[in-house]
């Protein structure tokens, strides 16, 4: 409904529902909203005390301070990157917002999701954007130009940094695969793929629920890379199950699955999609953190 009807769009609730489904109906939406409201109230007071309401980026500034600096707003506990199981392969909660709210440790999924929820609640402007295996925040600065907020190391990054660090092609940018601000529909498409991934992690299976998550997203965002990847993984799982059960016997079903797999790969290739290994990603984050510490040391 959130993709089909703009009036039903509610990013905060969409993010919550993934958490709620994965954790068997916990926490309650009321408790989740109460925690978000509490943070939002603190951020509003911070903006008011600093007389920053005259700036359109006041919400972005307040949230960045909340995430990255030791201050009373966050209990003198800034948010830091959690390198332990950062892809959520052992515990999918590592990717979810309720975990980061409790621990102030997160990674490139939970940090931007919480940032955007808070920014929406404050009436500010923020967008999600993708790089290979990475999610980050974009918003319009006071000068009308895009600003990239990199919460994993508490800095602002240029597009060129993402291109060099993650090996992003100009083709992928032109096709809206990477470094491009999500629309509301793409926000929900991303959350649907997060839901599909959480389902697969919980039940150790791709099935027609996970396929439906990707198919529904692709109806509204045909080149959305996350959905194309989930679709391909579904089809590959169906093919594997078929071979294990029936063997390599040809049938209309397996011919159709193979055809869809090739078509999906062709789309991913044509739009410039690329990915990096977990090891490469960890090295990128560690390098970025070291660069940040070096810059901070020079400023002292």
PLM regions and their residue ranges:
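Amphipathic alpha-helical repeat scaffolds of TPR domains
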Residues: 181-202, 223-245, 274-295
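Canonical positions in the second alpha-helix
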Residues: 216-217, 268
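Helix-turn-helix repeat elements of alpha-solenoid scaffolds
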Residues: 165-172, 203-212, 257-258
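Short coil/linker segments at helix-helix boundaries
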Residues: 241-270
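Secondary-structure boundary elements
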Residues: 4-98
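Stable alpha-helical elements in mature extracytoplasmic
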Residues: 59-63, 111, 115, 210
């Amino acid at each position: 409904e959130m993709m089909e009807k703009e009036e039903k769009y509610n990013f905060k609730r969409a993010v919550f529902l993934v958490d709620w489904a994965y954790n068997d109906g916990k926490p309650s939406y009321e408790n989740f909203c109460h925690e978000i409201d509490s943070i939002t109230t603190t951020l509003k007071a911070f903006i008011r005390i600093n007389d920053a309401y005259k700036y359109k980026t006041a919400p972005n500034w307040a949230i960045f301070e909340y995430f990255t600096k030791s201050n009373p707003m966050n209990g003198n506990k800034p948010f830091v990157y959690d390198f332990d199981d950062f892809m959520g392969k052992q515990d999918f909660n590592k990717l979810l917002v309720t975990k980061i709210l409790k621990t102030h440790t997160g990674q490139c999924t939970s940090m931007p999701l919480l940032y955007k929820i808070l920014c929406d609640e404050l009436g500010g402007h923020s967008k999600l954007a993708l790089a290979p295996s990475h999610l980050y925040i974009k918003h319009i600065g006071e000068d009308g130009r895009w600003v990239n907020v990199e919460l994993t190391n508490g800095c602002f990054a240029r597009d060129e940094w993402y291109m060099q660090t993650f090996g992003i092609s100009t083709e992928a940018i032109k096709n809206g695969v990477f470094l491009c601000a999500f629309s509301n529909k793409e926000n929900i498409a991303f959350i649907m793929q997060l839901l599909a991934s959480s389902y697969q992690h919980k039940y150790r299976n791709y099935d027609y629920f996970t396929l439906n998550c990707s198919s529904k997203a692709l109806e509204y965002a045909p080149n959305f890379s996350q959905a194309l990847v989930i679709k391909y993984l579904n089809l590959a799982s169906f093919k594997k199950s078929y071979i294990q059960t029936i063997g390599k016997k040809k049938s209309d079903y397996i011919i159709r699955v193979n055809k869809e797999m090739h078509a999906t790969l062709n789309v991913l290739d044509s739009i410039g999609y690329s990915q990096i290994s977990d090891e490469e990603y960890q090295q990128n984050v560690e390098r970025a953190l070291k660069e940040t510490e070096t810059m901070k040391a020079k400023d002292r």
